[in-house]
Amino acid sequence: MSSSAGNQVRASHILIKHQGSRRKASWKDPEGQIIRNTTRDSAVSQLKALRDDILSGKAKFDDLAARYSDCSSAKRGGDLGPFGRNQMQKPFEEATFALKVGEMSDIVDTDSGVHIIKRTG
């Protein structure tokens, strides 16, 4: 049985972890030195600047994800692959399912940190 289009999405994201993140380490900061010293406000400011660069055409989403995201998906340009309901944290899932393909979210907060999400499928 194939899943209908409404049950699965595909997305890429850029995650910036901060002091309030559940896990204060990442592939690019294994000891969490930077993350422990990053406030949520500064993480949001960084993400907003990246989002502005993408929207203005100055940079590509996948290039910025590869460079700045604290998620290991950075190695794939932020691509998380396809996922369905109840597979991601609720705020992340709701934001992704609300986007149209090709659209990018505003800032989304989860226990992992702050994200911008681009729905790709």
Curated annotation (Swiss-Prot):
Region described as Disordered: spans on this chain: 1-32
Top-level lineage group: Eukaryota
Notes on activation and inhibition: Inhibited in vitro by juglone.
Tagged with keyword Isomerase: yes
Polar residues biased stretches: 1-10
Reactions mediated catalytically: [protein]-peptidylproline (omega=180) = [protein]-peptidylproline (omega=0)
Matching InterPro entries: PPIase_dom_sf, PPIase_Pin1, PPIase_PpiC, PPIase_PpiC_CS
EC class (word): isomerase
Record field: compositional bias (Basic residues): 15-25
A GO CC term attached to the entry: nucleus
Domain PpiC as annotated: residue spans: 6-121
Keywords: Isomerase, Rotamase
GO MF term set: peptidyl-prolyl cis-trans isomerase activity
Job of this protein: Prolyl cis/trans isomerase with specificity for phospho-Ser-Pro bonds.
Cross-referenced PANTHER family: PEPTIDYL-PROLYL CIS-TRANS ISOMERASE, PEPTIDYL-PROLYL CIS-TRANS ISOMERASE PIN1
Protein name: Peptidyl-prolyl cis-trans isomerase Pin1
Protein source organism: Malus domestica (Apple)
Gene (name only): PIN1
